[in-house]
């Protein structure tokens, strides 16, 4: 179980049509507010723009991965995600 301390939080929107990353370049953790785990393709904090996305499963609730970008996927229509750091 993850219990991070989050001071800033927001909604991850439009993931079906465009990649998500914070405009200020901050890295973040992902909260899955859906009812089931979801597989996302992400770039982790230490990865560069040239690196390929990696696929990983995000459980319901806050997840420990520190992410810099999430890849868009048209199948994520019923996924509810939040970012926080």
Protein language model regions, located:
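Surface-exposed, low-hydrophobicity beta-strand/loop segments enriched in small/polar/acidic residues
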Residues: 1-85
């Amino acid at each position: 179980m993850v219990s991070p301390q989050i001071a800033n939080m927001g909604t991850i929107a439009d993931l079906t049509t465009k990649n998500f990353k914070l405009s200020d370049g901050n890295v973040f953790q992902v909260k899955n507010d859906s009812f089931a785990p979801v597989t996302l393709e992400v770039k982790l904090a230490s990865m560069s723009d040239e690196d390929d996305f990696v696929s990983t499963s995000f459980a319901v609730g806050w997840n420990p991965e520190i992410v810099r970008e999430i890849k868009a996927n048209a199948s994520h229509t019923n996924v509810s995600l939040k970012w926080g750091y």
